[in-house]
């Protein structure tokens, strides 16, 4: 599995991901963040967003999603990046239903843990 240092990222993208990990893990200590998509594969275009999966032990509800959105929005503005967020409960993500999702297959194949 690749590390963040090995990826073809612009410096502002690298810093944004580092700050995202720090802030999300401060607020949700059990969080796991996985980069996937074109940035993880190394074939991103100029307009590509940064796709991230955030796994959390808590139940996913509107309030939690709003908290994550506030964190990501501030970082997006600061570093001039755009995140594509998927937030899931860790137990659900391990379930057979989640494992049957094409998104899950892609993240398993190309995902990079931050």
What are the functions of these language-model segments?
Residues 1-32, 41-46, 57-114:
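Catalytic core of pol beta-like nucleotidyltransferases
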Residues 36-38:
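Glycine-rich beta-strand-to-loop/alpha-helix junction loops that act as flexible
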Residues 49-55:
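Short, aliphatic-rich beta-strand segments
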